């Protein structure tokens, strides 16, 4: 898939990022992963993000990532697969090349590791990764890797395969400046934790879609909310926010890392063998899983 094709796919509907299952020896479990990806691809997501943030990219080795991408491609049907990519520049360039060799359709460039960097350094990092691959690249603005509008404009001029921008800062002023400056040069994707909570605000800032974590275990509900959002059906959006998303947010906020662990628990609760989260994350307690189960059962469609 060429960069313009993945750009179009990214903007064509609701997106998600499958969890990465691990077996009893803490190894990537390909069979249950493929079963889950196949199920998700039946709910019309144009793109799934393999080995993304909710897929525990931060706990994967670079060698595991192409295997995960290959497994996803084999089971996703017509759904495009974009892979997580990140760490330091040279590691990220290597991951980008390995994802392309594994048949991936694009990469989502997550923040580099640990250290803060000036805009010139961020520019050099993103440019180097874009130059390492012919695939389309989406940058993820968050934490220690926040590109300002002028830096992003330079990258758009210098990197034809930079096709997407995902925001996890929540800084609507910055993202509105970026969408005003870049226009349709990029596809824009909301990337806040439990993105539905922020979807209306981002829609007003020209972000027409987002990646839904709960799509992992209640995809029909996620699609219902997204359809209501795009149709301007605020009554349905408010109803689903109050009955599902705010209670889920309350559970997710109990401990650091639950933005991933709660999603993985949800996948297990709907019948998939997702296994545990890897350290340094912790799984939900038994009591918390019961709370999540009741929430899911009340919203199955």
UniProtKB/Swiss-Prot annotation:
UniProt key word Ribonucleoprotein: no
Gene3D superfamilies (UniProt xref): Aldolase class I
GO biological process, one term: D-glucarate catabolic process
GO molecular function: 4-hydroxy-tetrahydrodipicolinate synthase activity; 5-dehydro-4-deoxyglucarate dehydratase activity
Known EC number: 4.2.1.41
Pathway annotation from the record: Carbohydrate acid metabolism; D-glucarate degradation; 2,5-dioxopentanoate from D-glucarate: step 2/2
Keyword Lipid biosynthesis: no
Enzyme class: lyase
Reaction(s) this enzyme catalyzes, per UniProt: 5-dehydro-4-deoxy-D-glucarate + H(+) = 2,5-dioxopentanoate + CO2 + H2O
Keywords from the named record: Lyase
SUPFAM superfamilies: Aldolase
Family under the similarity heading: Belongs to the DapA family.
Protein name, as recorded: Probable 5-dehydro-4-deoxyglucarate dehydratase
Protein source organism: Cereibacter sphaeroides (strain ATCC 17023 / DSM 158 / JCM 6121 / CCUG 31486 / LMG 2827 / NBRC 12203 / NCIMB 8253 / ATH 2.4.1.)
């Amino acid at each position: 898939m060429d960069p313009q094709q993945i750009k179009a796919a990214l903007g064509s509907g609701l997106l998600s990022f499958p969890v990465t299952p691990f077996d009893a020896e803490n190894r990537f479990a390909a069979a249950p992963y493929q079963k889950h990806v196949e199920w998700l691809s039946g709910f019309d997501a144009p793109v799934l993000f393999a080995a993304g943030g909710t897929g525990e990219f931060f706990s994967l080795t670079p060698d595991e990532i192409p295997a995960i991408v290959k497994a996803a491609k084999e089971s996703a049907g017509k759904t495009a697969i974009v892979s997580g990519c990140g760490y330091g520049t040279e590691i990220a360039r290597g991951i980008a090349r390995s994802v392309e060799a594994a048949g991936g359709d694009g990469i989502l460039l997550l923040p580099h590791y640990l250290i803060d960097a000036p805009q010139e350094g961020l520019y050099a990092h993103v440019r180097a990764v874009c130059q390492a691959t012919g695939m389309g690249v989406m940058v993820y603005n968050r934490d220690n890797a926040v590109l300002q509008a002028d830096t992003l404009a330079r990258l758009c001029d210098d990197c034809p395969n930079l096709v997407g921008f995902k925001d996890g800062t929540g800084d609507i002023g910055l993202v509105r400046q970026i969408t005003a400056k870049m226009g349709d040069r990029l596809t824009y994707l909301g990337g806040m934790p439990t993105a539905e909570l922020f979807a209306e605000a981002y829609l007003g800032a020209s972000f027409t879609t987002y990646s839904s974590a709960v799509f992992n275990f209640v995809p029909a509900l996620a699609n219902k909310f997204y359809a209501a959002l795009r149709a301007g059906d605020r009554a349905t959006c408010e109803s689903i926010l109050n009955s599902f998303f705010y209670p889920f947010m309350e559970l997710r906020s109990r401990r650091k890392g639950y933005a991933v662990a709660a999603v993985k628990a949800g996948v297990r609760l709907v019948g998939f063998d997702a296994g545990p989260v890897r350290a340094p994350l912790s799984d939900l307690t038994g009591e918390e899983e019961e709370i999540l189960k009741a929430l899911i059962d009340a919203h199955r469609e």
